[in-house]
């Protein structure tokens, strides 16, 4: 009976250690995304302070730069994850050949792009009568890109 309790205690300690290590990884990844967003947003705010930025169109151009930077980061991270997924195929194990991983990652990325397009177009259409409609849509795209960075981190 004593050995049984020792085994349970040892197993619990191992599980807690693994969960703690994963939480540490999650926190590091979250922090990296937060730092990226803070840096990009600081550049956007600096752009808005420029003396030649006067109109809604001018401020939208600053926002568009932020969206492009975020989308480039998403594409880079996606390509890194795809390279990892393709490498998994080269090293199958007794559990899986991993052939579906790149297929699913590609589908996930494609569907994410379609979702962002529809979601942000909806926001644009809701505010179509106003001058800030493009800004709302661009901000929507930026927020989705930052969220996607975090989501791609889930693809080990």
Predicted regions: what is each one?
Residues 13-21:
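Hydrophobic h-region of N-terminal signal peptides that target proteins for export
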Residues 2-11:
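Sec-dependent signal peptide recognition
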